[in-house]
Swiss-Prot record:
Belongs to the archaeal MetE family. Zn(2+) binds at residues 217, 219, 241, 304. Its EC number is 2.1.1.-. PANTHER family: 5-METHYLTETRAHYDROPTEROYLTRIGLUTAMATE--HOMOCYSTEINE METHYLTRANSFERASE. Binds 1 zinc ion per subunit. The keyword DNA-binding does not apply. One of its GO terms (biological process) is methionine biosynthetic process. It comes from the Archaea. Pfam families: Meth_synt_2. This is Methionine synthase. It comes from Aeropyrum pernix (strain ATCC 700893 / DSM 11879 / JCM 9820 / NBRC 100138 / K1). Gene3D superfamilies: 3.20.20.210.
């Protein structure tokens, strides 16, 4: 692929991963679940949706993009359906009126074949040289958001999940992946030292010897309670929700001497209100004035995935975010 695109050294812009389902993706998900189309046909149909997502990112000016996770009905279920050892579960309420089919671990979890490589590679082929993050749900979130009827031992299960995830990451690394992001939203729901340490052991398996940029995304919850226990994770960057919680975490980052890169969430993905350029710029200024890390370590992005927003709102939010980052480069 071409590497003609130059990612800014200060305040590069990126996304957490998901994007509103557009084009034929939603219908293709239903047809695949009903057994009306094959896995191969499913991904082929979804290419049109991925193309539209990438076009939106390029239009907005985002530097490091994703495939928009257009084939993922759910961040856990998608992988559970493609790993050996899982079977389908029943509907479980997550929050408000949001439900998902909580999968069941019924046997030994193993990687069988590439799960998200095809979508990611297609996005790379049409990205106009922009890097495309390889984004996968992490072992702790897979563990927490599944029913275990086989292992009876959380450590055994999370380590098998970590090995399966690493196998998928190896497929991406062999194809030149530059940014590897592991999503762990479940960690903030159990903000305890022992849970943070369990995930660290799993991440040691996932990231050992990985030369690409290693990123972990965590969002919401009381992350400040476990911040001291995650700072030594084998990662280059933590991608963090900030806007929705009114940047509550910033003083804690300062207190604990945070020095890794930060994916700095400046867009509230739960609000349909589009942040102004000035509002986003002010959020960036707020971080810089605290002198936690330099501008070369700040990746400007939304709090979380954009999938629950209308497409026009997502586009507008990204456009303003990119412009705010550009202005910040001129100042900082």
């Amino acid at each position: 692929m071409s590497h003609s695109y130059s990612v800014p050294k200060k305040f590069p812009t990126t996304v957490v991963g998901s994007y509103p389902k557009i084009g034929p993706a939603s219908e293709a998900i239903k047809k695949r679940r009903a057994g009306e189309i094959s896995e191969e046909e499913f991904h082929r149909i979804a290419r049109e949706s991925i193309r539209m997502v990438v076009e939106d990112y390029i239009w907005a000016g985002v530097d490091i993009i994703s495939d928009g996770e257009q084939t993922r009905e759910d961040m856990v279920v998608y992988f559970a359906e493609r790993l050996e050892g899982y079977r389908e579960g029943d509907w479980v309420r997550v929050f408000d009126n949001v439900y998902f089919r909580k999968p069941i671990v019924a046997g030994r979890v193993r990687w069988v074949r590439p799960m998200i490589i095809e979508d990611w590679e297609y996005a790379r082929s049409i990205s106009a040289g922009r890097p495309v993050k390889f984004i996968i749900t992490g072992p702790y979130t897979m563990l927490e958001w599944s029913f275990d009827l086989h292992y009876g031992d959380r450590r055994e299960l999370i380590f098998d999940l970590a090995r399966a995830i690493r196998r998928e990451i190896d497929e991406a690394l062999a194809r030149g992946a530059e940014y590897i992001q592991v999503d762990e939203p479940a960690l903030s729901t159990r903000p305890f030292k022992e849970e943070a340490e369990l995930l660290k052991e799993a991440l040691d398996i996932i990231f050992k010897g990985v030369g690409a940029k290693r990123i972990v995304h965590i969002c919401y919850g009381e992350l400040e309670r476990i911040l001291p226990y995650i700072l030594d994770y084998p990662v280059d960057q933590f991608d963090l929700e900030m806007k929705n919680s009114n940047f509550r975490l910033l003083p804690y980052l300062k207190e604990y001497g945070y020095d890794k890169e930060i994916g700095y969430g400046v867009i509230d993905v739960h609000s349909f209100q589009v942040e102004s350029v000035g509002e986003v710029k002010e959020a960036i200024d707020r971080l810089m004035k605290m002198d936690i890390v330099g501008p070369e370590k700040v990746y400007v992005d939304p709090d979380c995935g954009l999938k629950r927003l209308p497409r026009d709102v997502a586009r507008a939010k990204l456009k303003n975010m990119v412009e705010a980052a550009r202005l910040a480069r001129e100042e900082w």
